[in-house]
């Protein structure tokens, strides 16, 4: 299985690259967010897409580049991490707002719904957070899948399309069960069937 990894110019992309390679058995195809257009991405032979963390805000096109097109138009499963998670909320009409507290390498216990990305992961697992923005009110097509003890949204899922987002960093060495989460994304991709059979 091969993942297209959209790099939003973030140092954590390197960690994602290695962990996805281990989980999938194939190295991801890495493309910077301003390197290729949507029409240039679509011929790539990949099974799913991960949108990396990055600096900036999801409503600023220069910060997320082609990530917004991916979220709007892709029929492949997509996982957004941190900025990618916020971009999923933004593109569907959700609110992205200042966090109650800026998180810079902080560990937080995360609770979740136990399904999808979080299948087989214990409640209260520790995850690393680097963010000053959070997802707020969500549109009807998204639902919350994970949260902190003070109810900050940590995971979202589209109700009808194969789109997921996590605010924390599963690729960090300090995040518990990050490998399991990415394996779950791989398995969710397999459950969708081959690209030609989707839609």
Give the positions of each predicted feature:
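Residues in and immediately flanking transmembrane alpha helices
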Residues: 20-23, 144, 170, 182
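Flexible gly/pro-rich beta->alpha loop and the following alpha-helix that scaffold active-site loops
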Residues: 2-3, 11, 15-80, 92, ...
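Acyltransferase
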Residues: 173-199
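Pocket-forming structural segment of enzyme catalytic cores
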Residues: 65-73, 77-81, 86-176, 188
């Amino acid at each position: 299985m091969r993942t297209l990894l959209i790099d939003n110019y973030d140092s954590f992309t390197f960690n994602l690259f290695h962990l996805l390679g281990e989980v999938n058995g194939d190295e991801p195809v890495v493309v910077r967010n301003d390197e290729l257009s949507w029409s240039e991405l679509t011929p790539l032979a990949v099974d799913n897409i991960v949108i990396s963390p990055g600096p900036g805000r999801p409503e600023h096109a220069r910060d997320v580049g082609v990530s917004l097109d991916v979220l709007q138009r892709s029929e492949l499963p997509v996982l957004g991490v941190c900025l990618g998670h916020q971009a999923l909320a933004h593109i569907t009409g959700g609110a992205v707002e200042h966090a109650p507290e800026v998180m810079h390498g902080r560990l937080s216990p995360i609770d979740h719904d136990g399904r999808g990305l979080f299948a087989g992961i214990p409640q209260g697992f520790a995850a690393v957070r680097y963010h000053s923005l959070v997802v707020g009110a969500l549109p009807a097509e998204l639902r919350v899948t994970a949260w902190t003890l003070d109810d900050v949204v940590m995971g979202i899922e589209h109700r009808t399309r194969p789109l997921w987002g996590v605010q924390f960093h599963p690729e960090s060495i300090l995040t518990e069960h990050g490998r399991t989460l990415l394996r779950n994304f791989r398995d969710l991709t397999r459950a969708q069937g081959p690209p030609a059979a989707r839609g």
